[in-house]
Design a protein with these regions (language model features):
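Small-residue-biased structural context
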Residues: 1-185
């Protein structure tokens, strides 16, 4: 089993490559059904990946890395992606702005990946430098990823929570106010 496990950074980088490949395939696709299928795969992969980072990797980094701002920026970048993912999951390729939303999501994800993987100063480099047990984190990420994939298979994508958009959750592509910030009438 140890030979098949990946450290956390290797696992997250593999996820990055998979999503980049799906975006590349979308750019070359012409048929609506193919585009919709690719977007569903992209959204599923991103949902799982963001959940893994937010539940396991980012908290471990927040406690140990030198530049805490990088972790906070990552949460905000995820929240922006979650809005587009929620919108795309409720859309079809013929909808207005569909292709533009996929394009913007691709740009945002590629920027996020570049920041995380930046040599020497990105979050992954900082995690290594801080001495995090990346093998143990990798095992936790793999176990949680399997749970999430099984959950998605049986129940569909979960409702995603935003962290930096205080008091909001996303349903059908729109922020839903939790009642925390209500005005007295």
């Amino acid at each position: 089993m140890a030979s098949k496990s990946m450290d956390a950074v290797a696992l997250l980088k593999a996820d990055h490559r998979k999503v980049e490949d799906l975006f590349d395939k979308f750019e070359k696709a012409h048929e609506s059904e193919r585009k919709k299928s690719l977007v569903e795969q992209i959204c599923t992969e991103l949902c799982v990946h963001m959940t893994l980072e937010e539940e396991i990797f980012y908290p471990a980094c927040q406690a140990e890395v030198e530049d805490k701002d990088v972790v906070e920026e990552s949460y905000v970048e995820h929240d922006g992606a979650k809005v587009l993912v929620a919108e795309l999951m409720e859309s079809v390729p013929d909808d207005e702005f569909y292709a533009a939303k996929v394009s913007v999501l691709s740009e945002e994800v590629r920027h996020h990946v570049k920041e995380e993987e930046k040599r020497g100063e990105g979050l992954f480099a900082q995690a290594r430098k801080a001495g995090l047990d990346l093998d143990a984190l990798g095992e936790r990420l793999m176990a949680r990823k399997q749970e999430l994939m099984e959950q998605i298979e049986s129940q569909g994508l979960p409702t995603m929570q935003t962290r930096s958009f205080t008091g909001h959750r996303l349903e059908q592509g729109r922020p839903v106010h939790s009642g925390i910030h209500t005005a007295a009438g």
